[in-house]
């Protein structure tokens, strides 16, 4: 399938089937407008309690939607027809904290001791921004969102520690204020930004070179606005070095059956 094709109007079931059958492996930004998108972190059960506490201590970076029992591939809370081992466009596999490979399904890697954490994603508030008349640059340019490692520390928990990863979207000052107001309503999608303006204040030395995703144009009259990001666990995994871990690939999310509006507040 043409990865550049807009999928906003494609019914969710059809999009999920494309992903499940490896016919769509691109970024899910702008896809399935209005539906909650989610990051995944899959760990051996012996590491799960520490990571659960890590999520609870860091709700902006890791807004927990739900967690499975060991070996469970399905979560009724997010959708009746979701298979956590097949329904993400691309998974990243880590051994001892080091990235090993990218795969399109987990059929040969699944184990009965694996616990899956489903974490909210900022893609979930994109539709609310668009409906309010705001333009999202990476969607307009047909790109993945820009994501950066930062110097912002997470609160440590057990084996897990590390720094935030953030996503960035540029806005004029007036639109940035509106974006802050809107995204504050979505705490399960990272909520309000963690920073805006000078990227060097959070350890980003070259905003034109994201650590993950794609670079986008930032116009002279715009400021970069930074949100917590579900790639944070991947940064933490590199430091904490669990023997085995699987995550989604940055920008390539699990799309749930739940509406983003169900998780809105205010």
Swiss-Prot record:
InterPro entries, per database record: D-Glu_cyclase, Putative_hydro-lyase, UPF0317
Disulfide bonds: none
The enzyme's E.C. designation: 4.2.1.-
The keyword Lyase is assigned to this record: yes
UniProt entry tagged with the keyword Aminoacyl-tRNA synthetase: no
Single Gene Ontology MF annotation: lyase activity
Keywords on record: Lyase
Superkingdom assignment: Bacteria
Pfam family, one: D-Glu_cyclase
Signal sequence extent: none
Enzyme class: lyase
Similarity field: Belongs to the D-glutamate cyclase family.
This protein's name: Putative hydro-lyase VF_1377
Taxonomic path: Bacteria, Pseudomonadati, Pseudomonadota, Gammaproteobacteria, Vibrionales
